[in-house]
Amino acid sequence: MGCSHHWRGQAALATAYFLRRTELSFIVLDAEEAAGGAWRHGWNSLRLFSPATWSSIPGWMMPAVQDGYPSREHVIDYLTQYEARYQFPIERPVRVTSIERVTGALRVHSESSHWDAKAVVSATGTWSNPNIPSYPGAELFRGQQLHSADYVEPQAFSGKRVLVVGGGNSGAQILAEVSKVADATWVTPTDPLFLPDDVDGRVLFERATERWKAQMEGRVIEQPVGGLGDVVMVPPVVEARERGVLHAVRPFARFTPDGVVWADGSETAVDAVIWCTGFKPALGHLQPLGCY
């Protein structure tokens, strides 16, 4: 086999698109039951914060939507149709467990089989490796803790005292809807930064692209105020601001069995903590190669 390729979303499909245009023999290994990658696990109300044209992958543009930014279901449908359009050789569900060097090849192991390839593209992303910060007393806390990767909808927190931890877009969006049904507090390491109401995620793509080009060319560029983690003012976040709930407090010091202790020594009873604290690269399968 010329190339083995395992994936969780858009980057993998884009790579497969270009591999398909070569004479290489390749196969795509996907851990999911069906198309959609990490989008299959996003919360119900999740939407892109940029137009469809800015979230497309090579070869076929994502169809536009009439009601603002594409929903989770729209993205999954696009990825499903994209996969079918190009008839990529995909095997699923296959969870790659490790990759090792053998004579003349790289051997890709799953739980029940293996493949030998001259090259391997790891497009596993980060979704399967959520980052949860270490806090003193976390193991003693009797309430619920979950990462945004496992969050589905706000109704599960109705009437509860909830901490939403994390200052990025996921934190702002989850706070916006949980605060409608729960006593929610937003916890961030610093004051969140917000893009202007009339600016969407396109500016983040532009900043990231310019930063990458500068790095490749050895240039130093002046970055605008803010960064790639600035909160995009999508309608639910704007509505939360209008309700007066879009304000954050600094992190607590430690957990107690029934809540948290803040830096000033005060205590708050808490029923649930939603960690919107990002992800780490899901590259543990590369450890046998010594490159991760």
Regions found by a protein language model. Name each.
Residues W43:
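Glycine-rich loop at the start of a catalytic domain that most often binds anionic cofactors/ligands
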Residues F49-G68, Q215-E217:
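Glycine-rich flavin
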Residues L46:
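The DNA-recognition helices of helix-turn-helix-type DNA-binding domains
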